[in-house]
Amino acid sequence: MSDITVTNWAGNITYTAKELLRPHSLDALRALVADSARVRVLGSGHSFNEIAEPGDGGVLLSLAGLPSVVDVDTAARTVRVGGGVRYAELARVVHARGLALPNMASLPHISVAGSVATGTHGSGVGNGSLASVVREVELVTADGSTVVIARGDERFGGAVTSLGALGVVTSLTLDLEPAYEMEQHVFTELPLAGLDPATFETVMAAAYSVSLFTDWRAPGFRQVWLKRRTDRPLDGFPYAAPAAEKMHPVPGMPAVNCTEQFGVPGPWHERLPHFRAEFTPSSGAELQSEYLMPREHALAALHAMDAIRETLAPVLQTCEIRTVAADAQWLSPAYGRDTVAAHFTWVEDTAAVLPVVRRLEEALVPFAARPHWGKVFTVPAGELRALYPRLADFGALAGALDPAGKFTNAFVRGVLAG
């Protein structure tokens, strides 16, 4: 049988596998895992590197054929969600039961399991990564057996943001809170020169979730997106002018795809993402990178980016600045430190983008910038150990749960070799 190929959402990566398996029951999944020599799980495909490449004659496993599980416990304010469920579906079910997630990423079309496995996040000085609300992980391990790791287990710090290296995540249990409404306000032209460390903190704390956007063609930020919970005050925003029309983070792109703006109230899950769930992206003419740094270095890091903006701008569609509260997941880019995140949406030209990524990484070295695991980066494996102080502990956990390395690949081995 010849190998099959699968491309990611952006089309910049082609995964090669012996087979693409789509089990329709947990029993079938357990049998397939036990019978396969090497396994990687294919989520929603919104990664931009080879994290899902099985290699070595391995198989790709899709959870899309499994029954969709979203079991809400309203009394406990928790939800058990299946490994193949995406945030848009989860949010609709949870909201219908009068509950909510505390945060979401910019795109609601991504899978829950894949998002928390790579440290994906939204924004907000008080909001942790998406993994921070996980209270329990259910895994199918290398021999096909099920292992449950819950908050309080000494292994839990390595079990959620795990890069798919421990087993197949078949379900996650998440903490919820009462449903709330939000409104979104967009402002334009926030000068970098007007920001000192205290003002930057004030800007990023001006609402429940704040994002700054720039194309680095000039100093400063072209757009500021404030997402306010209606049960919390917004005392004005004197640092930039209100937008005169609905905006898209990427100049020239249709704003109809974005969530409601101009302060129109709506459910949390229709305001926290930047993009509407009804808008289903079929492919993305883009590459993405992201680097997360201690928040106390935010302004210095922004000036370091501004110093190389003539290098960045020609291959950049937009750059988004967000904040993430510290969390306790060993491989989370926000592990142990309140964080500022700089996300880059590049043009779809790998040859042109990679040299710029390397130059950017050089500029951010003084700020201990951790790369997002699911995006384009070139940080050498040898530098990751200094960036992730619990990397050796994670390697020991992976070795204990998967001693033969069934769930590893070249990407994971490179990380663990750090």
Curated annotation (Swiss-Prot):
UniProt enzyme class: oxidoreductase
SUPFAM superfamilies: FAD-binding/transporter-associated domain-like
Impact noted for substituting H46A: Does not contain FAD, and shows no oxidase activity
Catalysed reaction equations from the record: an alditol + O2 = an aldose + H2O2; xylitol + O2 = D-xylose + H2O2; D-sorbitol + O2 = D-glucose + H2O2
Enzyme Commission number: 1.1.3.41
Domain FAD-binding PCMH-type residue range list: 13-179
Binding, FAD: 41-47, 106, 111, 114, 118-121, 169, 322, 372
An example Gene Ontology CC term for this record: membrane
Annotated family: Belongs to the oxygen-dependent FAD-linked oxidoreductase family.
Summary of the function given for this chain in its UniProt record: Oxidase that performs selective oxidation of the terminal primary hydroxyl group of several alditols, with a reduction of O2 to H2O2. Shows highest activity on xylitol and D-sorbitol, and a poor efficiency with D-mannitol and L-threitol.
Protein name: Alditol oxidase
Lineage per the UniProt record: Bacteria, Bacillati, Actinomycetota, Actinomycetes, Kitasatosporales
